[in-house]
């Protein structure tokens, strides 16, 4: 009996790993992915964002946008199950594309809530005619975002900051000229 207990004691970590090793294994398994949370009614604004990200090397492996073919939900998949697995299996960086349409969509508000609960990092992009004062819900209205109808210099500055965040998060090098003129 004593020798059996010694064997169990010696190997207990194999069967009951401590919480820190469980957390680190889960974190290692999660790969970064950009999730563009938007209303499908705003697709004309979302398409150029996806094109810009694709031009710098983002693929459907690390970019999700439900309204854009090749970046959305595959055929025969349950929408909510697919979205749930995206949130649980990836380290998402969320780009909220905010508008009145966004706040009128229960699906968008669900995405916002999921990102808030999971404490995902995010950037807010406000569409033309949507103001910071209109930001509501789980998105922090005091967190600096960008407005597509800001003056060109400010918008370029904010886009450059977004490029730097994405470059760091995804380990890619994107020359400024390629980013600004994509």
Pin down the residues of each PLM region.
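Conserved beta-strand-loop-alpha-helix hinge of the TIR/SEFIR fold
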Residues: 1, 82-133
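C-terminal interaction surface of TIR/SEFIR-family domains
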Residues: 1-28, 44-47, 51, 55, ...
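Conserved N-terminal substructure of TIR/SEFIR domains
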Residues: 11-94, 116-118, 179-181
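Residue-level detector of short, conserved catalytic/binding motifs and their immediate flanks
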Residues: 32-34, 113, 123, 143
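Structural motif
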Residues: 38-40, 98-100, 149-150
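Conserved beta-strand scaffold positions in the cores of enzyme catalytic domains, especially
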Residues: 63, 122-124, 145-147
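Residues at the C-termini of beta-strands that transition into short coil/loop
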Residues: 67, 126, 149
């Amino acid at each position: 009996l004593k020798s059996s207990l010694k064997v169990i004691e010696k190997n207990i970590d194999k069967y009951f790993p401590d919480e820190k090793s469980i957390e680190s294994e889960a974190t290692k398994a999660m790969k970064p992915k950009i999730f563009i949370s938007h209303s499908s009614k705003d697709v004309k604004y979302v398409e150029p964002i996806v094109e810009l990200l694709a031009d710098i090397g983002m693929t459907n492996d690390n970019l999700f946008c439900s309204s854009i073919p090749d970046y959305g939900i595959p055929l025969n998949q349950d929408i909510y199950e697919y979205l749930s697995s995206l949130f649980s299996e990836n380290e998402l960086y969320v780009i909220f594309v905010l508008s009145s349409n966004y706040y009128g969509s229960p699906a968008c508000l669900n995405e916002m809530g999921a990102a808030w609960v999971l404490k995902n990092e995010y950037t807010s992009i406000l569409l033309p005619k949507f103001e910071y004062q209109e930001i509501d819900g789980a998105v922090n209205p005091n967190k600096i975002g960008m407005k597509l109808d800001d003056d060109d210099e400010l918008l370029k500055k904010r886009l450059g900051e977004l490029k730097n965040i994405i470059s760091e998060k995804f380990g890619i090098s994107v020359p400024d000229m390629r980013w600004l003129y994509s």
